[in-house]
Design a protein with these regions (language model features):
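N-terminal Rossmann NAD(P)H-binding glycine-rich loop of SDR-like oxidoreductase domains
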Residues: 3-25
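Conserved beta-loop-beta element that borders a ligand/cofactor-binding pocket
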Residues: 160-184
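Amphipathic terminal alpha-helices
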Residues: 304-320
Length: 320
């Protein structure tokens, strides 16, 4: 297959490109820079330089492909245009920075997925989009049949935008990723949590720390995207979860041991002071099952687990 991948030089997208190439597929990828284009070309993929707002480019690239994997994501200010930044801070004055960011993210994602879907319309070809486990129903082990909680920020807009094309002849599915997609080179949640503990001299958890986090290795996630592309069902929501529920206290305790700082309980009200923007996520109890995903696609996570990966990569000098 000829597969078009957005976010092709990102943390997850670059692993997806490598997985597809190793499986014998041809790949073209969207990247935002000339340096990214050079990286893709060295990997053996064709490169397009552009952004998610360039809908004509997305539509044309999708139409020329046999299928699309959408992993591109706006992670922060560095990923935003000047216009987006102005809108973000203007919106922050009317409802908060998180709400403003999520509105911009939803509009950008929905528009980009709409362009990709229109390029695949009436073809029966696959469109696989990245979504998230966060904010599925709390306090239970969420399954692939569950929908996101509607009154909090989540990635459900990506799923809705893709599934709108099912009735228009597109085999759309979603891969819901664990909040912790780990591996060598990770710059996501866990490195920020380690950095906060190193900076503040303490490794906290919320309350009793029994709330559960999911995790998946980057390479296992990449394999799941490939399988969803090749075999995925229209409307399916696959769970990119290698470990279904790790008590956050265990994560905090490992960090405390490796940094030689105390692990302590703090109330929710102090989470933002220590963790910054991640404060609202730390106390979530969001375990999730991958049973249906494994049975349906034959996906078997094979890489090392979160704690082994943390020991190997997350406490060296480069992680400071």
């Amino acid at each position: 297959m000829h597969v078009f991948v957005t976010g092709a030089t990102g943390w997850i997208g670059s692993a997806v490109v490598e997985e597809l190439l190793s499986a014998g597929h041809n790949v073209s990828g969207l990247t935002t820079s000339a340096a990214g284009a050079q990286k893709l070309q060295k990997m053996g993929a064709k490169a397009y330089v552009g952004k998610l707002g360039q809908h004509d480019l997305l539509r044309k690239s999708a139409a020329e492909s046999d299928g699309v994997i959408h992993t591109a994501f706006i992670h922060g200010l560095s990923s935003m245009s000047l216009g987006m930044r102005v809108r973000l801070f203007a919106g922050a004055l009317n409802g908060g920075i998180v709400s403003s960011f999520m509105r911009i993210l939803a509009e950008t994602e929905s528009g980009a997925i709409g362009a990709l879907g229109s390029g695949l319309e009436n073809s029966g070809r696959p469109l696989v989009v990245a979504s998230g486990i966060l904010y599925l129903p709390q306090g239970k082990v969420a399954t692939e049949k569950d929908s996101h909680v509607s009154n909090v920020p989540n990635r459900s807009f990506s799923e809705r935008a893709a599934f709108n094309f099912i009735q228009r002849g597109v085999r759309a599915s979603a891969v819901r990723l664990a909040p912790t997609v780990h591996g060598d080179g990770d710059h996501g949640f866990i490195p920020h949590i380690v950095q906060a503990a190193r900076k503040n001299g303490v490794s906290p958890y919320i309350g009793d720390g029994a709330n559960r986090w999911t995790a998946v290795h980057r390479l296992d996630a990449a394999k799941l995207f490939r399988l969803a592309l090749e075999k995925g069902e229209a409307g399916a929501k696959y769970h990119g979860v290698g470990e279904a529920g790790i008590p956050f206290q265990d994560i905090a305790s490992l960090i405390a041991t490796r940094l030689n700082v105390p692990a302590v309980s703090i109330p929710t009200s102090k989470a933002a002071k220590h963790f910054g923007m991640l404060g609202g996520f730390i106390g979530l109890d969001n375990p999730a099952s991958n049973e249906w995903t494994r049975q349906t696609l034959g996906w078997n996570p094979e890489q090392r687990g979160l704690f082994a990966d943390m020991d190997a990569h997350y406490f060296n000098s480069a992680a400071k």
